[in-house]
Amino acid sequence: MLLWKAAATKLRGVKGMRGFRDKIKGTKTKLLRRDSKDSTEEASAVRPSKTAKGGPGTGTETGSGGSGEGSWGRKSKRHSLIGRDPSRSDQSLVAPSDRTFDTTTDLDTTSISGNGNANPTASANGDIVIEGGTAPKRRSAGKEFDNLEDGTGLQPQLLNTTAKPLELSPAPPLTDTTGSIESPSTAAPDKGSFNCELPVVLSQKDSLKLNKNGILVGVESRPPSQIPLAENENLQPQPQPQPPQSNAAATAASAASVSALIQPSEGTPSKASTTGQSSTLSLPSDKTVILESTTPAVPSTSTPSTNIAATTTTAAITTTSVPAPTTTISRTPSRKLSDRSSDLSINTTNLPPPFTRPYRLSQFPTDSSGLRADTDSSALSQLQRSSSRASLGIHEPIAPETVEPPFRDKRESSFSHGPETLVYTGPLLHNPPEPASVVPVAAEVAQTLHTVSETGTFQPTELARNESVVSRNESVKSRILSSSGSRRKHPLSFSRRQSLIHPSDTGLLRYLLEQESASPTTYGREGGSNIQSVAGLMPHSENQLRTRKVWVKRPGGSPTQVIVTEDDFVDTVRDLCLRKYTNALGRHYDSPDLMIRISPPLKPQSARARQMGNMQTHTDRLLNPDEVLCQLLDDYYPNGQTSEDALIVEVPQQQRSRTPRPSPGPHSMSYAYGQTVHDLQLPGEDYFTPVGTIVPSIPHSQSGTVRSTHNLPANPSSLSNYIANSPPPSSPGHRSLKRPGPVRMTTGSPVGSTTSSAPGGGGGGVMLIPRAGGVVPDRIRATNVEAPTSPSVPPQMVALPSSPGIIKPIPQKPASPGVLPAVTSPPAITRPPPKSKEITASIGTLDGQVPSINVLIVEDNIINLRLLEAFMKRLKVRWATAMNGREAVTKWRTGGFQLVLMDIQLPIMNGLDATKEIRRLERLNGIGSFSSSPSGPEDELSSADKLDKSLVFKGSVIIVALTASSLRSDRDEALAVGCNDFLTKPVNFTFLERKVMEWGCMQALIDFEGWRKWKDLASKPGASGGKTSKGGRGKASASTSAAAKKGKESSISVLDNASSSSSTPQPTQSVPIAGQS
């Protein structure tokens, strides 16, 4: 099953389902046959394409003497490979072990030699990469694992611990060198010297030959960037031919490489590096493999060195190649590449902790590049993808101090340090970029090889794929240069913030970075980095660094503080002061209206200034908006500003339009032309003087226009008549006093002196105004109404002139307190009533009675209609009903209605449309307020729009909207179409009574003549018969008729111009008072 999955993963790139199935089927059959054949063999490591002529020997396996006929000879069980993955076509060697070795033992090496001129047709088909991991154990590889304990299996080799770090140096353009691989014999190792394993994977793809000295030659190392990723197996790149090498040359090259490792190479290139780069690979203890590679030579740059040593599996890998500007450790892709291509892959990522169980073949799925999909973020995957990037960064060992790193990656494999240096020389770049400058970052020195670090060139596209290297030893620490584009960085020991330094202090930040680059420190040490030290001392908030508190106050107020920055102007401080004084200043002034005043200290602030006597003489002044406040405060207050030195926030002087009140005293008071009622205040300094306020009296002999200042009447009900221009409450339910409107009182020529009655006479003068809804007449008729006054105050008459003339007061007999004087639009002259009739009390509005009006109720709900009818019966007024809007318009055309209760939601025609129709007919026929400006000639009116002039249409009808909605929009809509008021259902009877009384009084004032004629008709004998009609519709009640007869004998007699022009003039005529029933 595992083979099937591997084959399926390998052939994912095949296009088409048919070809994919055929390819899978054939591959599966081949793999199954090969697996069954391998299970019968003793060694299941590698199946050579052609068996070498020289059979396995005790100490050496030789080929055909350099003939190159076979690629690998059949190996004994002792030297067999761990296993082979049939899902891949490459062959690999793995040398894992859990044992440690002593470097002082003798070398017992065995050589595998071969000729560089390998036969292309006899090479192995592909490559197999064996990784360490958690793959399950294969059946064919089980036997080899059992031989590890007794020493018969593959044994790991040690590094040459006496070698020094190796430096890279330029080499000739094309070089063929041979590096030797030396490993000691399997003697008793030191358990404490190493602590982890290093699996080394050798990918062999060329045909190798073993010479008689046991030297393996013919391994060609090519850059991964130059190896084509062949989608088709037929694409086979041509190999570069290798010249044959003699045994003596191989032995000399091996000795030179060993001596290069032993000689100190610190700061100077080694002998071996003059011809090329070499790395040593550790194989089993009885074998030494010499790898040859030929690559074009390019100028190289020497890199620092890192001491890396393996524990149970140690290897010194010497790769013969020309040094490149960058070094990349790449892995051979899992695809089938050229038969002549070879690659060296080292897996350093998914390494488990040391244990005795050997590694197994990797069966994880791979992507198109041959990398495992589940280890995409590993160091090997990232190095494989970044093959054109920087090489391994290495450092010199520093002070022998062991510090355990606080942060370690689970994927990191540990290696113990030794004096041996491992230098990787990677493939060439097609277009090698220029080496970029790196910014060193202090990294934790660890005892393990955490990640692979890359220095030198840097590509932004590979920013997230770089890794950093941290190596450690028990007694040695090494510094690692980490690339600035490292994907994984060590977190800082302090909490990271968005900004630690103010943007204006970029120079400080640049200085800290330069210091950090000059002398990098290690995170985890006591000192830490410069940036960390400075960041700990700096404030975490920008406001704490650049702000300042300033004292401000209002004139005579308490000081307070506002927070400003060091570069704020005075104009900015005005905004802050306006927010500080939101209620006192923010509601009446804008920010530019404020003025900031500064008061300098009275004495020098410092002792030096007092001694020298050179204190600057500052004076109080207003600050300009463009001045920097903090600089001014430093100049005025060198020792700092205190609350006593608070800046004063001033506002411009407000010009008061009120005229000064006259001086007190018993003299005449006058007012200027154009002075409003608001300026004429009583001595109580308010628009409404309390009732108990004592007002000084004025002699009655003063001439000119004077103001009534007699004592307030004791009766509170006449308070509204006392104030000249205060309108009465809008309804009985709203009796709260309101501020009078700006009504101007026109002044004319001076009026003559008023005459006074005899001392101790009856009442004082009262000025009357029409009720709300009426038009202010040109002349105001003043009458005397007796009111209780103080005996010490003589009675006086007050006249407000509007035109030249004199109005003489006429004394009258005391009338009932409930009787109010009548107001008519034409000028009238008061005459004394006949003495033969007695004054009787009449029914007025103050007695709680509703004027006699006719109400039209428009309601489609029968329940609401019956309730409104019951209300009208209790109010003793006439009414009529309608069930829809069209019927309401028809009944209104008959005339005689003073009030309409109109429901909004009505069938056929809703209340709003009915209201519009009524208002249109009133406008066309010139009724009410439209009588002065008719819309057009009367003959242009249609017959349907003409109203009967004989009917009573003297005033516009009052329409009140009734609805169950309390929304403001519905109310506005009703008032917009012509309704006078708005009521919400359900209607309270008490509230409705007050409203009907208010509307009746308004209608009596609007249509006084029509209402008087109706009174005359109702007063005729037999009009009502002393009984009410059925339902109260169309006729006045008996009580209303009796009230009308009593009103005919009213005490107030008015001679009207209209009545005087009648054919039978009457000296007196009884006129009912507005609002009287």
Swiss-Prot record:
Places the protein is found: Cytoplasm
GO biological process: phosphorelay signal transduction system
Listed InterPro entries: CheY-like_superfamily, Sig_transdc_resp-reg_receiver
Annotated Gene3D superfamilies: 3.40.50.2300
Annotated Response regulatory domain residues: 854-1000
Coiled-coil segments: none
Keywords, in A-Z order: Cytoplasm, Phosphoprotein, Two-component regulatory system, Virulence
PANTHER family linked: HYBRID SIGNAL TRANSDUCTION HISTIDINE KINASE J (PTHR45339:SF1)
Protein name as annotated: Response regulator SSK1
Native organism: Arthrobotrys oligospora (strain ATCC 24927 / CBS 115.81 / DSM 1491)
